[in-house]
Amino acid sequence: MLGKSTHKIAVIAGDGIGKEVMPHGVRSVLAAAKKFGIEIEVTEYNWSCDQYDQIGSWMPSDWKQQLDQFDCIFFGAVGWPDRVLDHISLWDSLIKFRREFDQYVNLRPVRLMPGVKSPLAGKKPGDIDYYVVRENTEGEYSSLGGRLFEGTDREMAQQISTFTRKGVDRIMNFAFELAMTRNKNLVSATKSNGISITMPYWDERFAAIGARFPDVSRSQYHIDGLTIQVVLDPGRFDVIVASNLFGDILSDLGPATTGTIGIAPSANLNPERAFPSLFEPVHGSAPDIYGKGIANPIGQIWSGAMML
């Protein structure tokens, strides 16, 4: 955020424990901004499943016009399945943000923090510290396909994965550039021995973009073997780049090895800043603990630190 006079942040606490942890996140961001001389202007939006019955959607129809003026979106959580089915609330909020604001990078740090016990024996802070760079707008979650002959013995469902050159190249480029700022080690998650069209293409673009970064050591693992190594030897990783589905898996598995996904942060980035980026904790809305005063705000605070 440095280099601009006033930074405008849209705050959306959302559902469940998002409403409980967001005040801690905002206070922390404002305190850090004051300490480092960063001018911040915060605007809060009370969009959630609460209003679904009234307006028939998670947020108003002009949401994009309202949010387009901001530099960043600071987000809490989405989902209250007793009111709105999860896939409806998610696709009516976060998925819209990611796609219509072209937030094509999902960035998740995986770090073992002091005071948190890893389920992996003998691990201490510093032993686990890497990033998962997930493609965030296409791939296996492209939503192309459909269903036919529902309710009959001919019923079928088909969903198509879409990998564009632009989409693959830009996520690879981001990952290589991130690796250059760290230990210059990048791993690609693939499955080209089983997924015979899209994954070989992914591998080809990994090699092509990698040729521009000769100082970065690069390797690739099939996703099944990679999940094993993330558990057995997480210290070997620095930056992992993955497709939408594989990144989704790895970015939950990784924080689990650090003791809990409950404090993990994430960033949904439009690196060119043509649209606002979104910062949110990994945890969900957790309706089962909402109102009990036990929600941990560290994920929200850490997401705020990534935003700054």
Residue spans for each PLM region:
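Glycine-rich phosphate/nucleotide-binding loop
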Residues: 229-308
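Extreme N-terminal starter segment of soluble prokaryotic enzymes
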Residues: 4-9
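Glycine-rich phosphate/diphosphate-binding loop of Rossmann-like nucleotide-binding domains
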Residues: 10-27, 31-33, 152-224, 236
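N-terminal beta-loop-helix "entrance" segment that forms/cooperates
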Residues: 37-61, 230
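Buried hydrophobic positions in well-ordered alpha/beta secondary-structure cores of metabolic enzymes
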Residues: 15-18, 71, 133, 175, ...
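Short acidic loop-to-helix transition motifs that present clustered carboxylates
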Residues: 115, 221-228
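Short, acidic/small-residue loops that bind anionic groups at enzyme active sites
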Residues: 95-112, 212-221, 264-280
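N-terminal glycine-rich phosphate/adenylate-binding segment common to multiple enzyme folds
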Residues: 53-158, 245-247
